[in-house]
Amino acid sequence: MCGIVGYVGDRQAAEFLLDGLSKLEYRGYDSAGIAVYDGEKICVEKSVGRLAALREQIKGHVPMGTLGIGHTRWATHGRPSDVNAHPHTDCHGDFAIVHNGIIENYLSLKEDLAAKGHVFKSETDTEVVVHLLEEVYSGDFIAAVREVLHRIEGSYALVFMSRRHPDMLLCTKQDNPLIIGLGEGENFIASDIPAIIARTRRTYILGDGELAVVRKDSVEVMDRSGAPVSKKIFEVTWNAEAAEKGGYEHFMLKEIHDQPKAVRDTMSQRITSGKKAISFEELGWDAAYLNSFNKIYIVACGTAYHAGLVGKYYIEKLARVLVEVDVASEFRYRDPIVDEKTLLIVVSQSGETSDTLAALKESKRRGAKTLAITNVVGSSIAREADQVVYTWAGPEIAVASTKAYTTQLVLFFMLSLYMAEIKETIAPEHTAELVTRLQEIPSQISEILSDVDPIKTFAKQYGFNEDVFYIGRGLDYAVSLEGALKLKEISYIHAEAYAAGELKHGTLALIVEGVPVIALATQRNVYEKTLSNIKEVKARDAVVIGIAAVGDTELQKYVDHVMHVPASDEFIMPILSVIPLQLLAYYAAITRGCDVDKPRNLAKSVTVE
């Protein structure tokens, strides 16, 4: 969620702070601010609204100095306002901080500090931290920050600056991401790689409980007791251009069109010509390992949860193992049966989703073996899990996930085949056929993307409806959920997905004349059943848009429009049928004039509970 940047070096800090924050806009925010030490005092500028408002506010009097911090805020404590925006300062302007997370014991701390004479200007939990720093400071900046960390409770990424110590920034984290970019005669701090990738690819990934002292020519990392921590440099492999729009109007459209390459890269080096068709060298599983589990949980949030629903189908059908899928925020609190015979698979594009990370930690505590599927190397979830497999989708900037989702499906399918081969629950010839179908996916996605005009037409025709329903059975139902989520999150149309067989159990009451129903009918084993459900909504004068495989001539008899996707095996169809749904959501949002990449009230990475 909130974006954090920091700079110490010889160049003007404000230039980097504003540019870095612009690269973090995808995380979602409602206000922005920077603080720069000008040689005498800490100059703070902040504004509610978009970053452009802050730029306009400081036009002609940009704070000058080579030490600074910046922040884009997502309101949790206190409404969006100039005074609640970060950075926050203490009573005398000696310190400034930026923060992502939640300080859980801020109220008791605030009462104590107020009783000692501290005056608070904002409604935020963050301001308590900077006043606490002022209270405990006695000349040693590092010791004071360490004392603050002993007193606060919660999740956080924090960056501290002091006009009394203008050669350094201090930063620390607990359950929220923070990285340090290593430059030449300058160093950077950020909550995510896009903020610094144009300046350096060499980074330290800060661990929970670690405190870094960042100067222009050095970085020292210690634990909370002050003991030195040795850090390994992580080299970012993608470049700044990968995080740019590349000529597309929006990041989301670019990322939709990135999918053939993203899928190809995710499959790369995992398809072999050896005895086993699928290889995950990073896992090294065998039959004894897989047979040691009596249950598998897939735990995720949002789009990743929808990918998990497809993953459940793949694993159960191919590897013949019982799988449960849970929303991470629910899994954490229902006291699930987790022990040493449990395999927990967590899915997160960013690798920083707070509820998913918490579920992972709790399951490990109970003895489960854990596997992470994520898109970000070195992320918190990747580091916490026992094992990790990556979707090589490249940076995904738009809030609405597209290429991360399709690569998650591809990875789940390959993982299921890998498990099935080990357990010998699939015939070699069937594996070979499925691998052939798998390798066709990139070109089939390209085929769908080559003709989007019919989808644009549907978006214009139905983009101003207030309700849209999605129906499907089996794998089609899982994809329906993702299609509805895409439409609602970027076009703000009320969209809901239902298992087609559940229509009679209440949903039919919502079907009235002219309401659009998007019906997925790609699964042959439930095809006739789905047709009967389509007839039910047509009988109530719904406008039905069908999703079917090329060559399906039956469906068009019962629907108003058809969007065709290339024909393939039932396992592959979810990866293909979601593409027109992504495009439909995108063009509906364009039709309605919505901010596609940064929809209201949403953030890319949900790093607070």
Regions found by a protein language model. Name each.
Residues 226, 252, 543, 556-558, ...:
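Generic C-terminus detector
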